[in-house]
Design a protein with these regions (language model features):
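N-terminal Rossmann NAD(P)H-binding glycine-rich loop of SDR-like oxidoreductase domains
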Residues: 1-7
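Short beta-strand element of Class I
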Residues: 13-15
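Helix N-cap at the beta1-alpha1 junction of Rossmann-like dinucleotide-binding domains, i.e.
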Residues: 18-23
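Rossmann-fold cofactor-recognition segment
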Residues: 34-53
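Conserved Rossmann-fold cofactor-binding substructure of NAD(P)-dependent oxidoreductases
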Residues: 48-66, 73, 77
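Rossmann-fold NAD(P)-binding glycine/threonine-rich loop
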Residues: 87, 95-127
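Rossmann-like dinucleotide-binding core of oxidoreductases
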Residues: 122-207
């Protein structure tokens, strides 16, 4: 929200939506307190909505005249938000693959399970869906592309490790949603030598 506010001269009016509108209002207060709103003439406001209620979410998108929906919710809501964007005819962005809460660690290729099945409908509706623009995938991909294009003559392998730096005084800190982290302990898929490999968690040790 802060980053979007910093670029609201391009993005225009911004609506934050969640089941609990109070959470959105706290974020808006933080944006205003830190003076993150680049163009104060643009609106920054909140609305309450259940993202799993596709008709209600579609109506909210239409009522707010939104042109882009940036989905920063749990991965369980990705497909309902995408369906609402298809119904409203607006651009969709998310930060991770969709997850079915009833299925733990589905087999890859994950995007083929849900997102790619809607590719033809996105094309028919003229809807752009930009997937996985969080950190991994997302920022990681951008750094890898930068390294390949500007810093190395050739790259054989790239190892991606999820780590935390520093200390905030807590015993355990997750890189992602804690539930997603624990689900991934059940089954671990890794891309090795151009193929998916399933191994037990912590099967490989780094020395």
């Amino acid at each position: 929200a802060h980053k979007a506010a910093q670029h609201n001269d391009v993005l225009g009016d911004i609506c934050l939506a969640s089941r609990r509108v109070e959470k959105c209002d706290q974020i808006i207060d933080s944006v205003r307190r830190k003076k993150s709103l680049k163009d104060p003439s643009k609106k920054l406001y909140s609305r309450a909505v259940d993202a799993l209620d596709i008709p209600a979410l579609t109506k909210l998108i239409q009522d707010t005249r939104s042109e882009i929906v940036i989905n920063l919710g749990t991965a369980y809501i990705n497909m309902s938000v995408l369906e609402a964007c298809l119904a409203a005819g607006v651009t969709y962005m998310d930060t991770a693959i969709h997850e079915d809460p009833a299925k733990v660690c589905e087999d890859p290729p994950w995007y083929a399970n849900y997102e790619w099945k809607r590719k033809d409908r996105c094309k028919e509706k003229g809807v752009t869906a930009i997937l996985g623009v969080g950190f991994d995938p997302g920022v990681v991909n951008a750094y890898c592309a930068l390294a390949v294009k500007n810093h190395f003559d050739g790259i054989d392998t790239i190892d991606i490790l999820d780590v935390n730096a520093g200390s905030h005084g807590k015993y355990f800190a997750t890189n992602f949603d804690p539930e997603i982290n624990f689900r991934e302990f059940k089954k671990v898929w890794t891309w090795i030598d151009r193929q998916w490999v399933c191994k037990p968690v912590h099967a490989d040790k780094w020395t």
